[in-house]
């Protein structure tokens, strides 16, 4: 059995899934695992724009290295990602460069964010999520490491993991995703 502490309550479970995104490495380190996980950190800023500008809902400027999306009289601009530690200081160099490029083509008004928003996405060394049984602990399962596409891929891997937990045939070949592909 596993005892999980949630706020001031504790719950006991037969099985537990570690699906804690960028915090998975920290959780599993306490259990003796050395997960080859890094963090893709991406930044974005919000700006107001003039009301009379008609823009596409989203543009990906490959050469400029940014994406912007519009919502009413606001625009959000995102930069590429950096590989860094989850708790590393903000590195605004990339997003600031992107903002300068965007100012050349769009009349940005007020910056609506004081500092850029920062998201840390868990990235396994081989770029594949880790899905399956924990190699050292009974009834412990992994489902994390979905890189910057976790919002769209983690639910599908959850279905696959549920099948694994129930000893059902999975809809995909799970071998490339198994945790034991690494010496943890």
What is each model feature region?
Residues 6, 36-37, 170, 175:
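Short linear sequence motifs
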Residues 134-184:
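C-terminal lid/capping helical subdomain adjacent to the catalytic/cofactor pocket in oxidative enzymes
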């Amino acid at each position: 059995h596993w005892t999980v502490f949630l706020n001031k309550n504790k719950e006991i479970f037969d099985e537990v899934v570690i699906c804690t995104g960028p915090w998975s490495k920290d959780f599993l380190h306490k259990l003796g695992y050395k997960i080859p996980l890094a963090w893709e950190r991406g930044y974005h800023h919000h700006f107001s724009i003039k009301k009379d500008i008609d823009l596409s809902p989203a543009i990906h400027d490959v050469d400029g290295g940014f994406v912007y999306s519009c919502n009413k009289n606001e625009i959000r601009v995102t930069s590429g990602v950096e590989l860094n530690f989850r708790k590393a200081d903000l590195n605004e160099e990339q997003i600031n460069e992107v903002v300068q490029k965007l100012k050349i083509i769009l009349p940005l008004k007020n910056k609506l964010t004081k500092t850029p928003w920062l998201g840390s996405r868990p990235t396994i060394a081989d770029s594949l999520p880790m899905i399956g049984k924990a190699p050292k602990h009974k009834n412990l399962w992994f489902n994390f490491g979905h890189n910057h596409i976790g919002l769209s891929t983690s639910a599908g891997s959850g279905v696959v993991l549920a099948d694994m937990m129930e000893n059902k045939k999975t809809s995909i070949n799970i071998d490339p995703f198994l945790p034991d592909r690494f010496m943890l």
